[in-house]
Amino acid sequence: MSMKRDRGFSLLELLIVVAIILIIATIAIPSLLRSRQAAQESSAVANVRTINTAEVTYLSSNQGAYGSIPELITAGLIDNRFTGSVSGYTFTVTASGTTYTANASPTSTNAGRYGYFALPDAVVRWATTTSATCSPCFPTGQSGNGVQ
């Protein structure tokens, strides 16, 4: 009669491994979420700059008038992804003749901590979001904090 040797892991060993995995996940997940949020905010700033460039081009070819997002799309200056949510942000342009405001509002509080906007001076500014719609975060005029 030969003795059969048990193979495998004990319940205690499995519980220790699961506990270690949970500890690592608890540390890593918030960091990953912050990284994703920072990437979405950087993308929003880049997209506002893209809209600024499109507005300058549109202005020079349309008798000194700025255009809305649909007008910029029709002119072929930006693509139609700006009609919806892009990287967690919704983009709007309010154009009235010789001025415009390009806004980037986070679609949720997880998408970004800041809303971004630009005026004809092409400086991208940020304002802290106070709600998911970011309606009060865009001041009128030249106020706001410049983005580096």
Which residues does each predicted region cover?
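Nucleotide phosphate-binding site architecture
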Residues: 30-33, 59, 125
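Extended, polar beta-sheet/loop recognition surfaces of beta-rich domains
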Residues: 3, 41, 70-71
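N-terminal single-pass transmembrane signal-anchor helix
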Residues: 4-32
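A short, surface-exposed interaction/processing loop segment used at functional sites
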Residues: 118-142
